[in-house]
Amino acid sequence: MQKYLSEARQLLALAIPVILAQVAQTSMSFVDTVMAGAVSATDMAAVAVGTSIWLPAILFGHGLLLALTPVVAQLNGSGRRDLIAHQVRQAYWLAGMVSVLVMIVLYNAGYLIGSLHNVDPLLSQKAIGYLHALLWGAPGYLFFQVARDRCEGLSKTKPAMVVGFLGLLVNIPLNYVFIHGHLGMPALGGVGCGVATASVYWVMFIVIRAWTNRAKSMRDIQLPQRFSAPDWKAIGRLTGLGLPVALALFFEVTLFAVVALLVSPLGIVNVAGHQIALNFSSLMFVVPLSLGVATTIRVGHRLGQGSAEQAKVAAWTAQGIGICMACITALFTIAFRERIAQLYADDPEVITMAAQLMLLAAVYQLSDSVQVIGSGVLRGYKDTRAIFFITFIAYWILGLPIGYLLGMTNLLLPAMGPAGFWIGFIIGLTSSAIMMIWRMRRLQRQPNATVLARAAR
């Protein structure tokens, strides 16, 4: 029991700064929406539409770079710190190449927005302008993620937390300047949010890079100042490890986007209730997501130390903590669902719909916790292909089709509207949780030599 308590303390010490960093990042999006909404409803809608395109594109790159965390953790645990700088340099090369692709996608997003039916021309123009401003922040965001993954792989999660809140503090005045036109700048409205956010991402990268250059704990793994050509073999390994995670993130983000589109013809009450429940459950998701990041670090570090048994302890301790926290957040959601809905809206019908959907959201928080921490465990074991297949099957083969049948058709039951899709979420996430646990157990039953050899690749 003592080894589990000791591991729990170390996991929480890593996870709490990650939770706060995620809160800071989520708050930036909230601030953008509120400050754009103060100009006009059109500006707020333009930011919302632009963000719905930005997120899948940038999270694909983010997922690709998550491969760096277990690589650094394993090298650090095995005492091969001299190899870390080379891996980080290749991750910067990878981030630069992915940035170009993301920028091309965002620059041409106008074709996607234009293909949507009945979109107000002014909204379309502002959304495209927002994306064209924001795309210049893509390299800064991805370079920041490389520096963050480097720190987290070394069990240093506080720098990203501090820099995240610094970014939030910088974002507010920059929004004010570019949205309303101060200090000689033109008033750009919602487009100004894109300019401000892109600038903030570069500020965050510069600050965290400066910190890593000066940190005493990282002096032995400083990046060489001279130019070095990309190591395509190392980049290929990082891509092979990160691509399944990137695709899994893409599947998840696009799933919720597709459901939002499918719910949209069901009327304002249904759409608003669905959006409120989804927004609140996304806030609750920050806790298990951060635990998943901490679990990747601990499992990778233990495997680097050559202890498959201690990696197993880290994995199951994280699942235990996650289930306990999910029970707390689920009970909180059930107890205060109506009051929470009232924070978002004052329409009684919308509040009732949101409160009903939050009951379903409370149910899926348990499965969501198990599956996202399971994904963190598998990343630590460098078994990322399994994450891709599990996510695809759970979300797109099971969750979405069942949700559509229950929500929009009478084939199984009378059409349930948004509730049907939420039942689909529960089925998909529960399936994912079961498959993640099955995969964890299968990996842990393999000979220690096999597990350690995979981790050392």
Swiss-Prot record:
Highest taxon above the source species: Bacteria
GO MF term list: antiporter activity; xenobiotic transmembrane transporter activity
GO annotations of cellular component type: plasma membrane
Stored InterPro entries: MATE_fam (IPR002528), MATE_MdtK (IPR050222), MdtK-like (IPR048279), Multidrug-R_MdtK (IPR022913)
Membrane topology summary: Multi-pass membrane protein
Family: Belongs to the multi antimicrobial extrusion (MATE) (TC 2.A.66.1) family. MdtK subfamily.
Role of this protein: Multidrug efflux pump that functions probably as a Na(+)/drug antiporter. Confers resistance to the hydrophobic cationic compounds norfloxacin, ethidium bromide and berberine. It provides protection against antibiotics produced by epiphytic bacteria, such as P.agglomerans, which cocolonize plant blossoms.
Name this polypeptide is given: Multidrug resistance protein MdtK
Gene that this sequence comes from: mdtK
